[in-house]
Amino acid sequence: FASFENKISLYKKPLRLVINTSGFLHSNHIKPEKRLSHINRSNIIKNFTINAIAPILIAKSIEKFIRPDLPFSFASLSARVGSIGDNRLGGWYSYRASKAAQNQFLKTLSIEWRRKFPLSIVSILHPGTCDTKLSKPFQSAVPKDKLFTPSQSCEYLIDIISEQKPSDSGKFLAWDSSIIPW
């Protein structure tokens, strides 16, 4: 993250918006676990490193570039499957747990930044199911009107981010602005 901080320091204006879009569900060699017997340590570590640890380290890296007297938004893509209260299907252990961990990190961050940066907003956003490599193997179960292009999803999320106020900081929201249970 040092090179990331160095690049930000070259930007001479205060940060106003950072959007984290990193995420990992599967690769050619790693599949989401359907049952307990599929869990292995390296898959858990990879999911947590990208989905939970990276977003909070990004926040840590940018904190020194935020001014308390200016509005600032930090938005991070999470996933509905990271909701403990909304888990009806089970499976996908590492992905679900890593997104739930991201949600906790960012909810906690929103409380700290409310004190340090009263005009800041931390947004935890579910973009919906997008027609990308991440969701491609699982799209057959998604209704056509709920499978978004990346551009559609971006429009929905930018609308949410642009309409939020500091009092909205720390909420877990879906692409349609509905609140997702923790």
Task: Please tell me what each predicted stretch does.
Residues 5, 59, 106, 154-157:
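Short-chain dehydrogenase/reductase
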Residues 1-14:
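Conserved Rossmann-fold cofactor-binding substructure of NAD(P)-dependent oxidoreductases
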Residues 103, 113-130, 168-172:
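Conserved Rossmann-fold SDR core element
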Residues 24-28, 32-53, 63, 67-116:
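Catalytic loop of short-chain dehydrogenase/reductase
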Residues 19, 75, 122-125, 135:
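Hydrophobic structural elements of the Rossmann-like NAD(P)H-binding subdomain
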Residues 14, 18-19, 23:
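Conserved hydrophobic beta-strands of the Rossmann-like cofactor-binding core
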Residues 124, 132, 136-182:
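C-terminal helical subdomain
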